[in-house]
Amino acid sequence: MVVDDSAVVRQVVAGLLADDPAIEVIAAVADPILAIARMKVQWPDVFVLDIEMPRMDGITFLKKIMAERPTPVVICSTLTEKGAQTSMAALSAGAVAIITKPKLGLKQFLVDASDDLISAVKAAARANVKRLQVVEKLTADAILPASDRHDAMLQTTERVVALGTSTGGTQALEVVLTALPRVTPGIVIVQHMPEKFTAEFANRLNGLCQITVREAKNNDRVVPGRALIAPGGKHMLLRRNGAQYSVEVLDGPLVNRHRPSVDVLFRSVARCAGANALGVIMTGMGDDGAAGLAEMRKAGARTLAQDEESCVVYGMPKEAVKRGGVERSVPLGAIAREIMAQMAG
């Protein structure tokens, strides 16, 4: 079901999806009130949902869906700062993917992005959204940030943790990062996410975690107690200068159809950290990160994968296991504990 107040978006999105023989569009409606009426007749397998709509906003509607009958939702949101904030709220409420749309040239953009849209809907149909319901864990930092949380951690470390994830990863990363203590090895993360969304995502996590979480900037140092998330639309590599790690943020072609790419990060970690690293590949569609994790393991790094049972989409971890890059597969709830155990000493 497509729910969007723009007649152009409804027409184009519904048409693109209907052209795929594996997808049936049961309805395309202008707002959530009309959607609710249609849902009484037939409940869809997947919703494609706008955020800003008349009579009921998309976030409120999403929460109603998840409370009544959890169903995969793909957000189709305008690429603005406000759109990024509301889309992050949607991911927190249980949406499984975001497709961004521009203010201008919308019809042509949707046609050009049809492959991404169709892939997102198909991946959403396979997602188990019941696993997306994560209880928000707040810390005192959400109300009053500790003034010394950065300064005490600015010594360097030879140990580094690299995390890679995609569909379902925003909720999975929240589970992992909020469970880590303040004294934690430096962390570098690739989460497949559009441009402008990663800063809002990092800011939200920073308010929930004992560690510092922020969107990476070029030449940021990787230090204990800090997690750096690759910016949407940019690749991120780990670099080493003597005893210090830092990140390089750069443009470049899509790798495995992604930018940032998990493979790019993992390969750089394998080359400059070797046995001092831990690689973790988590929920996500496709195979990005599978080759890079195998390179990390070959270089002496410890490697983990999120297990099938706890994944929203068991794609990236499955491919990493197939390619021999995974030492152990563990449940989502055990990953933080494994990070601390394997990086101790």
Swiss-Prot record:
Its EC number is 3.1.1.61, 3.5.1.44. Involved in chemotaxis. Part of a chemotaxis signal transduction system that modulates chemotaxis in response to various stimuli. Catalyzes the demethylation of specific methylglutamate residues introduced into the chemoreceptors (methyl-accepting chemotaxis proteins or MCP) by CheR. Also mediates the irreversible deamidation of specific glutamine residues to glutamic acid. PROSITE patterns: CHEB (PS50122), RESPONSE_REGULATORY (PS50110). The keyword Chaperone does not apply. Contains a C-terminal catalytic domain, and an N-terminal region which modulates catalytic activity. This is Protein-glutamate methylesterase/protein-glutamine glutaminase 2. One of its GO terms (cellular component) is cytoplasm. Its main location: cytoplasm. It holds the Pfam family Response_reg.
